[in-house]
Amino acid sequence: MNTIRNSICLTIITMVLCGFLFPLAITLIGQIFFYQQANGSLITYDNRIVGSKLIGQHWTETRYFHGRPSAVDYNMNPEKLYKNGVSSGGSNESNGNTELIARMKHHVKFGNSNVTIDAATSSESGLDPHITVENALKQAPRIADARHVSTSRVADLIQHRKQRGVLTNDYVNVLELNIALDKMKD
């Protein structure tokens, strides 16, 4: 009988520790010391939430930087979202897959050797909010033309928002860069 009582007590103590106290402690630590990160790293502009630093968005206007292609279309298809819920992930297609090749041709004019790899391929999560500085600099002339500013001004904006990669190329956050474009004075 003593063994059963000890087992029940240990089970209750473990449930309280692991199911209540530990999650409560982690939540409190997150909210006190890492409030921005614990709440999605949301970005506000003009007093409204426009996105997250951590999730890419689908940009199509010529006056904005375009992010990487997304294998999950940044969850922008409402019908798929309703049926499948929010998801992330790569396509898991091989380099010879005809659907992948067709998608790459859609994102890039094939035969153009002036395209960076991140402009043609999706990230592993399919939601990457960053592009390489090289990719951003190659988009700068298009954006400068659309906004009627010099390419060097757009390039300076890119350089000021550059983040250093440890084992990767330098990169920029597309949403933050596009907000900076909108804030740019003529």
UniProtKB/Swiss-Prot annotation:
Signal peptide feature range: none
Cell compartments where the protein resides: Cell membrane
Keywords from the named record: ATP-binding, Cell membrane, Ion transport, Membrane, Nucleotide-binding, Potassium, Potassium transport, Transmembrane, Transmembrane helix, Transport
Principal location: membrane
Pfam families according to UniProt: KdpC
Protein topology in the membrane: Single-pass membrane protein
Recorded GO CC terms: plasma membrane
InterPro entries xrefs: KdpC
GO molecular function: ATP binding; P-type potassium transmembrane transporter activity
The UniProt record lists the keyword NAD: no
Residues that span the membrane, as ranges: 10-30
Subunit structure as annotated in this protein's UniProt entry: The system is composed of three essential subunits: KdpA, KdpB and KdpC.
Free-text function comment from the UniProt entry: Part of the high-affinity ATP-driven potassium transport (or Kdp) system, which catalyzes the hydrolysis of ATP coupled with the electrogenic transport of potassium into the cytoplasm. This subunit acts as a catalytic chaperone that increases the ATP-binding affinity of the ATP-hydrolyzing subunit KdpB by the formation of a transient KdpB/KdpC/ATP ternary complex.
Similarity comment: family membership: Belongs to the KdpC family.
Protein name per its UniProtKB record: Potassium-transporting ATPase KdpC subunit
Organism: Staphylococcus aureus (strain COL)
